[in-house]
């Protein structure tokens, strides 16, 4: 499982700041030849006296460099969403400017150029903004029946009233919301609470602002959240020392069992018995001269017949067969 890494905004500053003015991008504009970005006013003013990129010195255009720059709306939205309060402060400065200079108002300018765009229209959320959310119990059986056509008819008043509405700051984390649910509903500690968006469990460090950005909440209603309660799964930890002791004791029991079986199954005849003892065979039948010891008595190969002596041998010499005795 991949671990999520959180980084500070200061580590992203080199990618969000203009090298000409040293501030965050405002009306981010990118040179199409090298893809370096700057503030619109900064790069336009710079290209009045130069035709080369301020960073890499690539030629923007031979005669009309303003033709090879483009407004980068995606980059500007990222900057507004990452830097707290930047969008609201910029809109306020624009409104103040046009209020102080009415003649500078351009009829063809957009509402954003005049600073008349609200945070809701731009979908920019600030940390101190209050977000309305709804939370209800996640019923798996109800989710399985979601495709039925008569689901609206089957809803009862209890199911409709089961949803609760809250107003929370955008910086509220899922961990805080889980603690609120546990204390509000007296859920024991041996049960785990999962806060979900649709059918996906949310991370504890997610804020309401993160959820609104990740799942593209359109502000057309309360942020819909759900929760479920399930028992906590405890993993049984095995002590390796105990496991090694049990394994050793099992081996000892098996060894003792084999010894008992051997002592019961092998009967060694006594020398005082009237029954003659069977001849002792060498553990090495092909090498009978090697002696073996049984019950402290050494038996030599001399008591056995040597298979290499007193045996007739057939010898062939120049086609004439002769038999000789060893």
UniProtKB/Swiss-Prot annotation:
A motif (Nuclear localization signal) lies at residues 81-95. It is found in: Nucleus. A zinc finger (RING-type) spans 18-57. Keywords: Chromatin regulator, Metal-binding, Nucleus, Repressor, Transcription, Transcription regulation, Zinc, Zinc-finger. One of its GO terms (biological process) is negative regulation of transcription by RNA polymerase II. The keyword Zinc-finger applies. The keyword Methyltransferase does not apply. InterPro entries: RAWUL, Znf_RING, Znf_RING/FYVE/PHD, Znf_RING_CS. Coiled coil: none annotated. One of its GO terms (cellular component) is PcG protein complex. Disulfide bonds: none annotated. Residues 239-262, 274-326 are annotated as: Disordered. SUPFAM superfamilies: RING/U-box. Residues 290-303 have a biased composition (Low complexity). GO terms for molecular function: promoter-specific chromatin binding; zinc ion binding. Component of a PRC1-like complex. Interacts with cbx4. Component of a Polycomb group (PcG) multiprotein PRC1-like complex, a complex class required to maintain the transcriptionally repressive state of many genes, including Hox genes, throughout development. PcG PRC1 complex acts via chromatin remodeling and modification of histones; it mediates monoubiquitination of histone H2A 'Lys-119', rendering chromatin heritably changed in its expressibility. In the PRC1 complex, it is required to stimulate the E3 ubiquitin-protein ligase activity of rnf2. This is Polycomb complex protein BMI-1-A. It comes from Xenopus laevis. The gene is bmi1a.
